[in-house]
């Protein structure tokens, strides 16, 4: 697990460093990158391609956000989508209750994310399963 700053540049740098460590014989190899957001994933894809690593054939990449640009990069980015409209509606409801002087009721809300498969991931072959 590497810590980043959610930027495209940092996604590129961290992936570049990971590639360098792997090639220097760090005792590990990797075949997938899962980032905290889509911008870092886009940076990771760029670093992999710049180092001659095929995405998704050699290394698969998945982001988190499903921002609009994730569909436009090459290959299109696989990602985890968040229920943004539902999150916004729940937040607005909570804010309105607070403005009206009503105490928010403590509760846990679970909103399900979705897996969006695009071009940076691939289906495993029977041999790979």
Locate each region found by the language model.
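Hinge/beta->alpha junction and helix N-cap segments in small-molecule ligand-binding domains
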Residues: 1-16, 34-42, 64-66, 81-90, ...
